[in-house]
Amino acid sequence: MAEVRVQLLLSRRPESVSFARSVCGLLGAGPGLGTWPIHCSLKRGRLVLSSRPFPGASARLPLQRPPFCPFAALEERPRVPGAELPTDRGVDLGVAVILQSSDKTVLLTRRARTLSVSPNLWVPPGGHVELEEELLDGGLRELWEESGLHLPQGQFSWVPLGLWESAYPPRLSWGLPKYHHIVLYLLVISQESQQQLQARIQPNPNEVSALMWLTPDVAAAVAAAEDGTETPGLLPQDLPPSVLAVELEEDGRARPLVLHMSTLLRMIPTMAEDKERVSTGTKFALKLWLQHLGRTPPPCKSAAYLDPGPAKEEWNMDPLPPNQGSGK
């Protein structure tokens, strides 16, 4: 099916974004790391972004890009012959689900090594949003396609966390970008425990080669290993040397995998390689999840939505507009 494109409200009406332009740059992002608060209209098959409030905006979310964003780098350089990017393509919309268990762990999956885009990376389940598909439905569909998990209606709550400008290859030293997305991270909070969810997981071996559940302390260490920074963040003294994951064998059977912490803390290399690591956007999403753990306002309920009420100063507290999430 056709894919959803991202639109920006830069003047009077929403307009599509050229593939070659940095979304953060067009919205007025400075040279720093961000994040930048962005007003969003999150509707069926459509994502509209603006740096200013506008009629129909239903959320105010943090937007960020990596410090090595290739689109930002290209805009700062003079044009080089042979370095032209497509002019007939836009920026696609992706959605990723940060699935939290009732005992406060989150699910990450390792992308299969055979995938042509971002192989061997640890990421939350996610993918493209299809036309006329609710954003939550798109995230839950991707969760089901990759992990086999179906979340029954009424047994989870959810809230949008933030937006990430993504490119692949992720930096110019790897080559010119071939893919350009804005990824919407959704926090989906299940009423089931990690053990209950794990018992129902049936990973798709064509997309997933391993999976693991992160506790808040491990997630904090992973988020602190920020790509593109000169010095890593301070790590807790009591950080475990490894975490237990589940790996899929070639015949589809699962086996325990002891994953060394150094793998999870690995940063993006300068030159292209497929070493196992946590993706840069995932580190951003984990940081937002950790911030959310300390908040008191309840997230949106599945198939039941909160009244937006008065404008809030904190981003990601405004609920999505009313819709009927199918949970499929």
UniProtKB/Swiss-Prot annotation:
At the top level of its lineage, which domain of life is listed? Eukaryota
Q: Where is the Nudix hydrolase domain?
A: 90-236
Nudix box (motif): residue ranges: 127-148
Q: Which Pfam families match?
A: NUDIX (PF00293)
- Top-level EC class, please? hydrolase
Q: Which InterPro entries match?
A: NAD-cap_RNA_hydrolase_NudC (IPR050241), NUDIX_hydrolase-like_dom_sf (IPR015797), NUDIX_hydrolase_dom (IPR000086), Nudt17_dom (IPR033716)
Q: Which UniProt keywords apply?
A: Hydrolase, Magnesium, Manganese, Metal-binding
Question: Region (Disordered): which ranges?
Answer: 299-328
Catalysed reactions, as listed in the record:
a 5'-end (N(7)-methyl 5'-triphosphoguanosine)-ribonucleoside in mRNA + H2O = N(7)-methyl-GDP + a 5'-end phospho-ribonucleoside in mRNA + 2 H(+)
Residues binding Mg(2+): 142, 146
Cellular component terms, GO, for this chain's entry?
peroxisome
List the cofactors.
Mg(2+); Mn(2+)
Is Magnesium among this UniProt entry's keywords?
A: yes
Report the EC number(s), separated by commas if there are several.
3.6.1.62
Provide a Gene Ontology MF annotation, just one.
NADH pyrophosphatase activity
| Single GO BP term | NADP catabolic process
Annotated disulfide bonds: none
Which SUPFAM superfamilies does the entry link to?
Answer: Nudix (SSF55811)
CDD domains hit by this protein: NUDIX_Nudt17
Q: Where are the transmembrane segments?
A: none
The record's comment on protein family reads: Belongs to the Nudix hydrolase family.
Q: What does this protein do?
A: Acts as a decapping enzyme capable of hydrolyzing monomethylated capped RNAs (in vitro). Hydrolyzes monomethylated capped RNA after alpha and beta phosphates to form N(7)-methyl-GDP. Shows low activity towards unmethylated capped RNA.
Name of protein: m7GpppN-mRNA hydrolase NUDT17
Species whose genome carries this gene = Homo sapiens (Human)
Gene behind the chain: NUDT17
